[in-house]
Amino acid sequence: MINISMLISNSEVSGPGGLFDFNATLPLVAIQFILLMVLLNILLYNPLLTIIEERKEYILTNLGKASELLSEANKLTQQYEQELDNVRKEAQLEITNSQKIHKEILEVELNISQKYIDNLLDTIQKDLLAKKNIALNSLDEIVQSLCVDIEARLSI
């Protein structure tokens, strides 16, 4: 193990070139530090900053495009929903109109059928009445002839 007291005793200033010697080493270290900062700035920080800026611009442009597309999609959605509502209303009107038309057609056909049936019943009644009258007349004639025959037989 390293003893702390030995480190302290070894770091004591025993002449020139100690721990706090301010000859040319301090400006040299400062120049090295500045050169290292310039090199790091040129080689590392500037490319990183440009990449970060490019990514930031890329993200912002894509975000802008995405928000534009989203707003356009929302507009199209609203437009299509409006058109869908209009089409539904038109379809409902068409359905009600066609139902009315079919109902009117059905009523007309029922009226025509009713008139036809009434006419048919009327002609059948007239025909039956005529046949009844003919049958009654023929029956009346037969009865008359039978009566004449009966009278003729009785008078013999």
Curated annotation (Swiss-Prot):
GO function terms (MF aspect): proton-transporting ATP synthase activity, rotational mechanism; proton-transporting ATPase activity, rotational mechanism
One GO cellular component term noted in the UniProt record for this chain: chloroplast thylakoid membrane
Cell compartments where the protein resides: Plastid, Chloroplast thylakoid membrane
TM helices/strands, residue ranges: 24-44
Membrane topology: Single-pass membrane protein
Keyword Thylakoid: yes
Main location: plastid
Cleaved signal peptide residues: none
Function of the molecule: F(1)F(0) ATP synthase produces ATP from ADP in the presence of a proton or sodium gradient. F-type ATPases consist of two structural domains, F(1) containing the extramembraneous catalytic core and F(0) containing the membrane proton channel, linked together by a central stalk and a peripheral stalk. During catalysis, ATP synthesis in the catalytic domain of F(1) is coupled via a rotary mechanism of the central stalk subunits to proton translocation.
HAMAP family in alphabetical order: ATP_synth_b_bprime, ATP_synth_bprime
Known partners and oligomeric status: F-type ATPases have 2 components, F(1) - the catalytic core - and F(0) - the membrane proton channel. F(1) has five subunits: alpha(3), beta(3), gamma(1), delta(1), epsilon(1). F(0) has four main subunits: a(1), b(1), b'(1) and c(10-14). The alpha and beta chains form an alternating ring which encloses part of the gamma chain. F(1) is attached to F(0) by a central stalk formed by the gamma and epsilon chains, while a peripheral stalk is formed by the delta, b and b' chains.
Similarity field: Belongs to the ATPase B chain family.
Protein name in UniProt: ATP synthase subunit b', chloroplastic
Lineage, uppermost ranks: Eukaryota, Sar, Stramenopiles, Ochrophyta, Bacillariophyta
